[in-house]
A protein has these predicted regions:
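Residues that mark the start of a beta-strand
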Residues: 1-5
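Active-site and donor-binding regions of nucleotide-sugar-utilizing enzymes
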Residues: 6-30, 35-131
Length: 171
């Protein structure tokens, strides 16, 4: 039975080429599907003639945009995917929260990240946890980091005043 594999085009084409090579080596004639912005569709059609493409509006991937576009969301979820890949043009997956939110709503068996060096990591995506961490915890983490930075600066200024102004006058 042929595997249904979905790739979200979140990386440059050199990484996508690496990923496609990996998929073709490890799977026998897979059904490959892409989610791509409108601007990348022609390049995907040129490179991968067999791929089915879900066209996402131009701009960055955003959960709210997909959620509003019911036709696109429904057409993506008609199939249960055996594997979903989230490629990155970088080693780390910083700022991929929106993409993870999108992937967590798609019917799938397994989800993998694929970085620019070809390292594959299986992901466990739970929509509720991702949404809570991204939408609610991020502001608290941001405020906490600002608070800690402010305290460190304040302590450094107090230390400087005591060491170089108060103690210097006593000697």
């Amino acid at each position: 039975m042929r595997k249904n594999i979905l790739i979200i085009r979140s990386a440059n084409f050199s990484v996508i080429d690496l990923l496609i090579d990996y998929i073709l080596k490890n799977n026998e004639r897979p059904n490959i599907f892409f989610i791509s912005q409108e601007a990348g569709v022609s390049s995907i059609k040129e490179r991968f003639l067999d791929g089915n493409i879900y066209i996402y509006p131009n701009g960055s991937f955003n959960y709210k945009t997909l959620n509003k576009n019911k036709h696109l969301a429904d057409s993506i979820n008609k199939i249960i995917y055996d594997e979903i890949y989230m490629p990155s043009s970088y080693e780390n997956f910083d700022d991929f929260q929106e993409i993870k939110l999108i992937l967590s709503t798609i019917k799938r068996e397994k989800t993998f990240s694929f970085n620019c060096y070809g390292k594959i990591t299986e992901l466990s995506l739970d929509f509720k946890v991702l949404y809570f961490n991204y939408k609610f915890m991020f502001p608290f983490k941001f405020i906490f980091s600002l608070l800690v930075t402010g305290i460190v600066c304040f302590i450094s200024i107090i230390y400087h005043i005591i060491k170089y102004h108060v103690l210097k006058n006593e000697v």
